[in-house]
Amino acid sequence: MSSVSAAGATPPASPGCIAGIGMDLLRIERIERALARHGDRFAQKILGPKELAKFQARRRRDPARGVRFLATRFAAKEAFSKAIGLGMRMPMSWRRVQTLNAPGGRPVLVIGAELADWFDARFGAAHVSITDESDMAAAYVIVERKPAPDGRP
């Protein structure tokens, strides 16, 4: 698991309390069908700019790998929306949170400016874990409670 603040910097380790947990599990075939039905518009609706560039590069090299990438990012966004308690309603939207990779490869959540103020006012760090295997993709997100001004969780 990894954590990133809304600004994209990895926060220091803290004894934060859990504010929310989200999980999503989906069949990769569901994403394949959506791409077949809606084409690139589907990926453009779901992915942020950096995710979209990575998706397109992976799909060019290996179409199946591109679909798995899109499925894990879809699952991460669903899991994040559940962890923060909003679902897919404002200020949360598909493109306002991206799952990118830290230099070592671990997945990190990067929250866009449109959502960052809302998130930072309520929460501390967000942690994400994603996986795909065979015909399934899954993501778990844990959101920490915002620490008290005196530093206590």
UniProtKB/Swiss-Prot annotation:
UniProt key word Magnesium? yes
Q: Where in the cell is it found?
A: Cytoplasm
Q: Which GO terms describe its molecular function?
A: holo-[acyl-carrier-protein] synthase activity; magnesium ion binding
| Task performed by this protein | Transfers the 4'-phosphopantetheine moiety from coenzyme A to a Ser of acyl-carrier-protein.
Q: What is this protein called?
A: Holo-[acyl-carrier-protein] synthase
Family label: Belongs to the P-Pant transferase superfamily. AcpS family.
Transferase as a keyword?
yes
Q: Which GO terms describe its cellular component?
A: cytoplasm
Task: Tell me which cofactor or cofactors this protein depends on.
Answer: Mg(2+)
Q: Which Pfam families does this entry report, sorted A to Z?
A: ACPS
